[in-house]
Every structure is written in C-alpha cells, then in structure tokens.
C-alpha cells in the first residue's frame, strides 16, 4: 500500500513453463470471495493482479487468449487433488483435509467465462 510492501508472490513453485499458468493459479487462490458457502469471482482483484504483474512483465495477446483454459486447468488440478485427499486420507491423519467443493465451484465459474476480457469486466 502506498510505498510499503504489502505482499510477495513467489511464482517459482507455481509453474516453470507457461507464465499465464502463474496468473491462473493466483486467480484461483486469491481472486474469489466467499459468501456463506458460495464463491464469487472478484474481477477487481484480477485487474489489480494483472496490473501489478504487467508492471514487471507484459502479457502477450497469445498469453491472454490462454487465460481461461489455464484457469480451468488450475481449478481442476486443485479440485482433483483435494478430492483424492478427501476420499483417501485416513481420519486419524494429522493434516487438515480441504473441501474439494471450493474448486468445483471455481471450475464452474471458469466454465462460464470464455475470454480474457470476461475476467476483467
């Protein structure tokens, strides 16, 4: 905020191939708001994320055209990982099992968006 650092995102473990996959993972993790049991996409957060990202690295038109499929892929990845853990982790395990339905909802939202501009407006 202002001239103060308010956060750092380490993209190293997100991916090392497609830079837009980094954005897709961040959108899924940071750009949804929860209202009771429902998730809603927050396009203002997406715009701010992209603005900050592009202050360092410009996003090409080709990359922009891949945003939707990468967001869906990232949501599917987390949904399936959580679903596996939900169904296969013993009740006695000392880890917190996360609800896979969160990422199912996000996947449905991504399926209703198609273009890069759909994420911003």
Q: For the regions a protein language model found, what residue spans apply to each?
A:
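A general structural signal for well-ordered secondary-structure junctions
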Residues: 33, 59, 113-116
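All-alpha amphipathic helical-bundle segments outside canonical DNA-binding/catalytic cores
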Residues: 61-71
């Amino acid at each position: 905020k202002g001239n103060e650092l308010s956060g750092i995102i380490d993209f190293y473990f997100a991916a090392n191939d497609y830079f837009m996959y980094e954005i897709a993972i961040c959108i899924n993790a940071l750009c949804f708001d929860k209202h009771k049991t429902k998730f809603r996409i927050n396009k203002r957060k997406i715009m701010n994320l992209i603005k900050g990202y592009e202050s360092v690295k410009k996003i090409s038109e080709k990359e922009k055209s891949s945003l939707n499929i990468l967001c869906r892929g990232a949501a599917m990845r987390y949904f399936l990982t959580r679903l596996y853990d939900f169904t296969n982790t013993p009740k006695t395990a000392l880890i917190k099992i996360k609800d896979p339905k969160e990422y199912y909802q996000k996947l449905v939202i991504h399926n209703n968006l198609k273009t890069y501009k759909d994420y911003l407006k």
